Structure formats: structure tokens, C-alpha cells
């Protein structure tokens, strides 16, 4: 998984897995969902990210432990 922010275009891209994108769907006018040939999610692209997300406080926590 990879999260990238492109400051010059104010675009946030979250890539969930590597793969060839064969279908891109508009979730709304500023959000694209990219799918592979099996219909699995590859990435989400968010335009105008600064006004639509809280980029300044973005962080994640990785949890490790026994599966429930």
C-alpha cells in the first residue's frame, strides 16, 4: 500500500496494490476509483485533496498481533 500527495496538482493517490488498471470509475466529480481486470480495487485518487481531507494530520497506525 502506498499513499502519495502531489502538491502541484493537490492530488492524493492511495494505491492498495500493484496491478494493471483496466477500469476507472468516477465516485464523484473529484474522486476516481481504479479497478483491475478482476474488479478488485487498485487505487483511489482524490482531487482537491487539501479541502476534502485532513492532510496535515494524516497518520496511520500499524497493528500487529494474533488474528481474532
Where are these regions (language model features)?
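Small, basic N-terminal interaction modules of short regulatory proteins
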Residues: 1-68
Amino acid at each position: 500500500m502506498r499513499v502519495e500527495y502531489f502538491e502541484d496538482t493537490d492530488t492524493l493517490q492511495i494505491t492498495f496494490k500493484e496491478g494493471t488498471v483496466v477500469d476507472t470509475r468516477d465516485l464523484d466529480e473529484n474522486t476516481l476509483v481504479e479497478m483491475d481486470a478482476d474488479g478488485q480495487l487498485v487505487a483511489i485518487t482524490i482531487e482537491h485533496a487539501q479541502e476534502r481531507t485532513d492532510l496535515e494530520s494524516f497518520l496511520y497506525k500499524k497493528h500487529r498481533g494474533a488474528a481474532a
